[in-house]
């Protein structure tokens, strides 16, 4: 597949994802939270050894992708409430060890993934992060979305700007921006009647604060 893409003088990145806490595999997450609509269902919290294994799996996947001819990696990631998003957001990260608490601790797993990929694949191997710039959620669980963005309980744009600056300082080569969460799927998977390019106002604000490339998802239907 990568050979076919390269034949047209194009580049191809592999998107590496881990959705734990948003699926039923082992019912494990960053902290003990309810991953489903039923608040009586609780996940178990990953131990530090289990977190290290998850990080190693990201790194091994990147190594395999490079062997397969992919030109870089998108860590998928810090949006929609997936594993790294659960680390990054205080509403889902209640840990008291080095992976919880302050913002830099909540980003530690994302940093360790990057460091590992760069160590194994080379410092010049591109690694970008996919990140939701605003969660549009008032709480956890089905029906907790906020169309107007008020009473935000997830990630705000202001916090995303701080995260973007930290990701750049860690060595990430770019950020793919979108908005929304499983609690606010209207934004995460915007329907056809949402304005095209509706994420651009958010990504434009982030771009003012970093020098790495900013990519944008969300109703970017027309390249012209």
Feature map (PLM): residue ranges:
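Flavin-dependent oxidoreductase catalytic cores
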Residues: 1-224
């Amino acid at each position: 597949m990568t050979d076919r893409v390269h034949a047209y003088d194009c580049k191809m990145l592999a998107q590496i994802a881990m959705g734990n806490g948003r699926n039923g595999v082992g019912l494990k997450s960053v902290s003990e939270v309810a991953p489903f609509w039923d608040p009586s269902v609780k996940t178990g919290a990953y131990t530090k050894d289990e977190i290290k294994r998850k990080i190693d799996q990201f790194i091994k996947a990147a190594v395999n992708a490079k062997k397969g001819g992919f030109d870089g990696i998108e860590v998928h990631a810090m949006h929609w409430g997936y594993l790294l998003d659960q680390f990054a957001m205080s509403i889902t990260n209640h840990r008291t060890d080095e992976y919880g608490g302050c913002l830099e601790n909540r980003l530690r797993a994302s940093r360790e993934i990057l460091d590992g990929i760069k160590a194994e694949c080379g410092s010049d191997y591109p690694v970008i992060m996919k990140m939701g710039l605003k969660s549009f959620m008032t709480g956890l669980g089905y029906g907790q979305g906020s169309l107007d963005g008020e009473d935000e309980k997830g990630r705000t744009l202001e916090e995303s700007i701080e995260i973007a600056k930290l990701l750049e300082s860690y060595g990430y080569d770019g950020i793919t921006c979108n908005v929304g969460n499983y609690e606010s799927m209207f934004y995460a998977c915007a329907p056809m009647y949402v304005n095209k390019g509706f994420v651009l106002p958010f990504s434009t604000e982030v771009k003012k604060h970093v020098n790495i490339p900013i990519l944008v998802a969300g109703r970017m239907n027309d390249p012209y």
